[in-house]
Structures are given as structure tokens and as C-alpha cells.
UniProtKB/Swiss-Prot annotation:
Protein name: UPF0297 protein lhv_0439
Similarity comment text for this entry: Belongs to the UPF0297 family.
Any Pfam family the entry gives: IreB
Organism expressing this protein natively: Lactobacillus helveticus (strain DPC 4571)
Length: 85
């Protein structure tokens, strides 16, 4: 039986990776290491959707692209308002 005949099982949670908080911490640190203003760069990315605002340094760009922008904004608003439920 070839591998094409087998049903594959996909576990979304297994492939989820880091949560938004951890990702933003890593991206923030990478931006600081490169000498950028992290807040300005992250805001630029969130408003425009252009990943060029985030450097490839320490894989920051790939990390942030694993999350939808609306998911990141939702987490930021919840955190800002203290509603992490």
C-alpha cells in the first residue's frame, strides 16, 4: 500500500507553534537587535500587512507570519484592556 492510499491526520494545535505573546516578544527583540523602533515597525506591519516591516533576523518575519494580523490585534486589545479571557 503506497503512502498516497493512506488517510493523513492533521492536528491543528500541534502545528500552531508559539502563542501571539511569545511571537511578539521574539519579534520585538529581533527588531531591537537590528536597531529599529520595535513599536513603529510592528504597527507598520499590522496596518499595512507588508512583512517588509519585520526583519528576517532571528526568523522574526516567519514567526509573525504564522499569525493572522487580526489575531494579533485581538490579543493586543485584550491585553491592553486586561481582558485575557
Amino acid at each position: 500500500m503506497s503512502s498516497l492510499d493512506k488517510t493523513m491526520h492533521f492536528d491543528f494545535n500541534q502545528n500552531k507553534g508559539k502563542n501571539v505573546y511569545d511571537t511578539l516578544q521574539d519579534v520585538y527583540n529581533a527588531l531591537e537587535e537590528k536597531g529599529y523602533n520595535p513599536v513603529n515597525q510592528i504597527v507598520g506591519y499590522l496596518l499595512s500587512g507588508d512583512p517588509a516591516y519585520i526583519p528576517r533576523h532571528n526568523d522574526a518575519r516567519n514567526l509573525i507570519l504564522k499569525h493572522e494580523r487580526d489575531e494579533i490585534i485581538e490579543e493586543l486589545v485584550k491585553s491592553y484592556l486586561g481582558k485575557n479571557k
